[in-house]
Amino acid sequence: RAGCVEVDPPGVRFSFVSHMAGLYFHIPFCSHKCGYCNLFSLQTNRADYIATYLETLHKQAQQLSPLTTGLAFDSFAIGGGTPLLLTVSQLEYLLETAALFGVHPSHAFTSIETSPEYADPARLTWLK
């Protein structure tokens, strides 16, 4: 697209036109592969895999965030896999990672993919 720049390290996607931007975090973990899904996903909830992935995503954000100085992120999406497979503390860490780009859900249209399997009271309260 004319005027659009995309940078796609694993797990992070952001694109921007002018000074508005959107940020996408891909969380590839799920309990099972849905028949309609054609996205990269890992059928696991192993804590060590998830922790390593989130730490790596955070390090990438630290490296890339200087490239986005001066941009206003008007959208933020978390997809997967099943992002709500993460614990509430891991979801909080994901928001801390987004904050490195200056993204906060109260200032950007925010969406997160989920499954009824993980829509428990603690996660639903966190989503509010």
Segments and roles (model prediction):
Residues 21-52:
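Canonical Radical SAM [4Fe-4S] cluster-binding loop centered on the CxxxCxxC motif
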Residues 39, 58, 62-128:
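Conserved SAM/AdoMet-binding glycine-rich loop
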Residues 27, 54, 58-61:
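Short amphipathic alpha-helical/adjacent loop interface patches that line ligand
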Residues 10-12:
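N-terminal leader/targeting signatures
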Residues 14-16:
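Aromatic (phenylalanine/tyrosine) cluster motif
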